[in-house]
Regions:
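Acidic/polar, glycine-enriched structural segments that form the non-catalytic walls/loops
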Residues: 43, 51-56, 63-216, 237, ...
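Short, Φ-rich (hydrophobic/aromatic) sequence segments
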Residues: 1-4, 191, 226
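Acidic-aromatic substrate-binding/catalytic surfaces of carbohydrate-active enzymes
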Residues: 1-27
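Extracellular/luminal low-complexity Ser/Thr/Pro-rich, glycosylation-prone repeat/linker regions
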Residues: 1, 9-11, 35-38, 156-159, ...
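Alpha-helical support elements that line or immediately flank enzyme active sites
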Residues: 220-247
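Low-complexity, acidic Ser/Thr/Pro/Gly-rich terminal tails and inter-domain linkers that flank the onset
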Residues: 20-53
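Glycine-centered tight beta-turn/hairpin loop motif at sheet-sheet or coil-to-beta transitions
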Residues: 6-8, 39-43, 112
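A generic structural motif
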Residues: 3, 29-31, 62, 109
């Protein structure tokens, strides 16, 4: 939410675009701050990036007004440490999350799992079950201003991990329909985001059982690796090594 005084307003979200399976942008208008002309001159871009163990959001205010713009930007975050089996069953969230606030950061713990949230340049406060991240933003005339927050997660009980290996899978579809190449790029990007490893081993496999399990299923992971042989035979080899060590 945003505002220039005690009252805050919700942005008017108008579009979404995905740069990858792990990177998405949302565009919004802030009409309460704009001038009276029909064409919007102030936009807010919200970019969300997810990598192994971290989620980051970046808010960029872009102004084409002739005067300086000042506003308060608020983001409400609701910590939730409910185990997946309870989410799957539809049970009410019951996992207690302990919070330790410290200026622009907060430490969150739930059993052995922990999270550290930071909002550089802002302030983190508690409001009921929510955390409210607040920034006082000043955007110069015809310029941009950016604030961000991120959360780092650590859970030693997880039986799978992400992978740090970068891949450059590329395929060119045959045919004249441009939608086919777009679909192919999306499919490869989704598969990239599905790569997992087991703790202490670099060998990768494709996650299966989404969304409730999202882990190693020998049959499903082998099928996926087999269908992917023409793109990256290394995925089949590493999947076999993973399964071999578990025999």
């Amino acid at each position: 939410r945003y505002g220039t005084d005690a009252a805050t307003h919700a942005p008017e979200w108008i579009s979404r675009s995905a740069g990858s399976a792990s990177d998405v942008r949302f565009e919004a208008l802030l009409r309460r701050l704009d001038d009276r002309t029909p064409d919007p001159k102030i936009r807010l871009t919200r970019r969300r990036v997810v990598v192994d163990g971290r989620m980051m959001e970046e808010f960029t205010l872009v102004s084409h007004l002739e005067e300086e713009v000042g506003l308060v930007l608020e983001v409400a975050v609701t910590p939730d440490a409910t185990p997946m089996q309870e989410v799957k069953s539809g049970a009410r969230p019951a996992a207690a999350v302990e919070r330790t606030l410290a200026g622009d950061a907060v430490e969150l713990t739930a059993g052995a799992a922990s999270m550290r949230l930071r909002a550089p340049g802002g302030e983190v406060t508690a409001s009921g079950d929510d955390l409210v991240l607040t920034w006082h933003v000043t955007c110069p005339p015809r310029a941009a201003a950016t604030v961000s927050w991120h959360v780092d997660l650590d859970d030693p009980s997880l039986v799978v991990r992400g992978t740090a290996r970068q891949v450059d899978w590329a395929l060119q579809a045959r045919g004249g329909d441009p939608r086919l190449n777009r679909w192919l790029r999306q499919a490869l990007d989704d598969l990239d985001a599905l790569r997992l490893t087991l703790p202490g081993s670099p060998d990768e496999f494709f996650a299966a059982g989404a969304p409730w399990f999202f882990t190693l299923f020998g049959r499903d992971s082998l099928w996926a690796a087999r269908l992917f042989l023409s793109v990256d035979p290394g995925m089949a080899a590493s999947t076999l090594r993973v399964l071999g060590r578990l025999q």
